[in-house]
Amino acid sequence: MKVTDFDYALPKERIAQHPMEPRDHSRLLVVDKHTGAMEHRHFYDLPQYLCPGDLLVFNDTRVIPARLYGYKDTGAHVEVFLLTRLNNTDWEVLVRPGKKLQVGACVKFAEELSGTIIGHTDFGGRIIRFAFEGVFEEILDRLGEVPLPPYITAELEDKERYQTVYNRDPGSAAAPTAGLHFTKELLQKIKDMGCEEVFVTLNVGLGTFRPVTEENIEDHPMHREFYSVTPEAAAAVNRAKAEGRRIVAVGTTAVRTLESAGATGAVKAGSSWTQIYIYPGFQWHIVDALVTNFHLPQSTLLMLVSALSSRELMLHTYATAVKEKYRFFSFGDAMFITTLLNSKKEISCTQ
């Protein structure tokens, strides 16, 4: 398939620059992945499209203040963007300007934090070894900036609005944005109706924004991300699958985690790197339904949601969303790609 097969026209004004307040007042486009039936609702209506026994899987990662500013011994200013933690002191990073930061270069960020470039990565980045006094996470909170996606140009007043309400595992360079719509009250309502929830962790990297540069989508080199699944989460998912209950992934990062850990048909507990690449023709093992935002044209995430339904249905759904003036991308509205919508566009848990 060609990357242009996943293109669509999006007016610039449809790109959301600010998060919706309250969180769950975003709009929700519900679409049946088999029939194409659609419903236009708000996110607080999501429980109406869930069934008792559904298992919702959330990514509990937290976005870190990944952008650091420092200077070399020469006084030259540099920018370091944290991507992946390798151990207590070493990180894979992006640097700017790259030519000024070769192996051996030292960077001073503050009195309590400095770093030395010790290697190159296979994606044009660097490996930096930090030296610090105190707790690294606390230093990072003081010195770093939380990065926003490049298509968001407005200033974000409350940085917690780029975090989910259930975040607890720092490590991401970008938010798992489907989760931004949930409030604590909505989560409780979903639990009270008999749904189950579990949490997995995938540290979202900047690769999530990397454009597909190859003409044929099959030739695209997929970025890697680190994920973790606890034994309790794996057991809950496998039990739900065995009992015929729906697995509802909250966000594409939850999808990547579940389908990576469940590549053999059953989810395995543990931590690992994944370069899973999901596009039409993918053989699904775990995920039945998906809560997700609207994704960029020609992106791997648009390919992923197309794999769960079909390319034609997703492009039709996106065209409908543009026409109906939905808000797009990280701070935008949401979709629920599901099953069980009957001819009246109502949920039918007994189908």
Regions found by a protein language model. Name each.
Residues M1-Q351:
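Surface-exposed, charge/polar-rich loops and edge strands
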